[in-house]
Each structure stands twice: as C-alpha cells, then as structure tokens.
Amino acid sequence: MSRFLSPTLSAVTPYTPGEQPQDQQYIKLNTNESPYLPSPAVVAAVSEAEVEKLRLYSDPACADLLRAAAAHFGLQPDQIMPGNGSDENLFFALRAFCDEQHPLAYADITYGCYGVWCGLLHIPSHIIPLKDDFTLDPKDYDGLHQTIVIANPNAPTGLALPRSAIEGILQANPDNVVIVDEAYVDFGGESCVPLIDRYDNLLVVQTFSKSRQLAGARLGLAMGSASLIADLNRVKFSLNPYNINRLTLKAGQAALEDTAYFDRTRAAIVDTRSWTKQQLEARGFAVLDSRSNFLFASTQKKNGGE
C-alpha cells in the first residue's frame, strides 16, 4: 500500500477472486463456471460487424437487451437494470439502500463480497448465523428493520429456500429492501421474480455467468419495482453510464432468446450434479441437497489440510 491510500481502503480486506490459471489445461471447478460453450446464437451475435462498432460507445439505456429480458421474465423494461456482472447490480443496491445508519443483514456463511462491500461503503454488517445443518431460518430475518440480502440458492452450501419462505421475509420487513441473489437459481431453485409485482421492497439479482455460459462477458440483471430500478439507475448514471459493452449487450440478448440451448445445458448440468452426488455418497461423503451447479460435501476420512 502507498502512503496515499485512504484510511477506508486501507482497512478493507479485498475479495479474493477464484484463480484463473493460464499456464495449462485443468478440470476447472473453483469458480462454478459452465462446462458448456456459449449458445451458437451468442457466437453469431458477436459478429465481425459488431466488433467493428467497438469504436462507438454502447447504448447506456441497454434498450434491446431490456426488451429481451422483459419478454423473458414477464416484466416491463423499467423493472430491469443490467449490470457489469451481477456483482455490480449488488454493489449498486448496497450503495442505494444502505449507509452508516442503515445496516445490511446477511448470513455468516454466504457470498464473501457482501462483507467486503460493507467495509468499503462504511455499512454496518448484521451477520446472522446459519443453523447447524447449514440451513437458513427465515424467522431470524423477521422484523429486522434493515436491508437484507439472501443468496438463494446459497453459496457455498447450494441450499435453497422455497419462494414462500422468501415471501414471508418480505412480509415481515415491508419497510426495507430484501435483495435475493439468484446467481444459481436456474439449477433447481425457485425464483422470486413472480413476486416482484406484489412486493415493492423486493430486488432480485441474476447473472449470466453460470447457466448462460457468459462469465467472461460480465452481465447481470437486477429486477424489481420500477421505483427500485430507478434508484439503481441513479447510482449507475452517477458512476458509469456505459457500464455494459456493446458485445456483451448483443451476447446477453441472444442468450436470453435461445431458450432451447439454455434448457438443454441446464438440464445436463443438473443430471451431472445428481450423478456426482450419488458417486460421492457411495464413497462415504456427506453431501448437501444442492440446488446449484456445485456440491457441498464433507468426509471423515481426511481433513481439509490434507
């Protein structure tokens, strides 16, 4: 660190991203990427003609992508905001709905960036322990009077709450935003997008990194009431209006529209997860009932240090 670094940043422990080795080929599992190539429609959309347009700024309104997303999710375009990866959507949400007087509540075992962002933005963290079986007890979130973020399915456990449980948390916190991070929802979770028109305090965040094979393109979506999305756009247009590049806009639109490829690759990953779980259990591992594209397993035969 230099002597010029601000006290705020010097006190923050940054997030450590998953290693991206470049030296040789690995069976790479550390960041839960898709084993499948992007949709052929995505490859066609990122054409030479589009590459030539990189001299021009991207559309800050993301109009074509928003129309495709609205049609796919059954929402209006003003209920959706694209982000440079769902991390940006989540960061914008914390910037919009939390501050030094308004804490963020989240589980003790969950996505590590929540705590990093709280440190960066001077947001107090209300960390709520999971139960001994790694499940989240919705009653722990009743009447908190705080912004809440829940990864559902959770990472790294892969466990998911039913939509009805999230709805109960929304009803118990009507005056605070409840953020549902659905990065892994397409592998067996129950999305809360159908609740958006009933709860103006619900913000759902999804990513194209896992089930749509676009981790390297960096694209996420925040979905909620038009008023919540307007709040997020207030942050976006104060920070980075051109947050989605031209090629990612085209790739994201094509990925949403190619539902057959999405369904086929998603089903294949779920089948592989089931087979792998059976194989691990046959070898004496305890494996949680994952609704994600990864498994949380343990064994008494060796400890982690070995």
Annotate each predicted stretch with a short phrase.
Residues 126, 130-186:
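Active-site phosphate-binding strand-loop segment of PLP-dependent enzymes
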Residues 80, 104, 178, 202-204:
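Hydrophobic/aromatic residues located in beta-strands of well-ordered beta-sheets
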Residues 1-56, 144:
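N-terminal "arm"/small-domain region of PLP-dependent enzymes with the aminotransferase-like
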Residues 201-281, 285-288:
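PLP-dependent aminotransferase class I/II
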Residues 270, 282-306:
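Conserved PLP-binding catalytic core of the aspartate aminotransferase-like
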Residues 63-103, 121:
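Phosphate-binding glycine-rich loop
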Residues 77, 85-98, 154, 162, ...:
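Glycine/small-residue-rich loop that forms an oxyanion/phosphate-binding "nest" at active or ligand-binding sites
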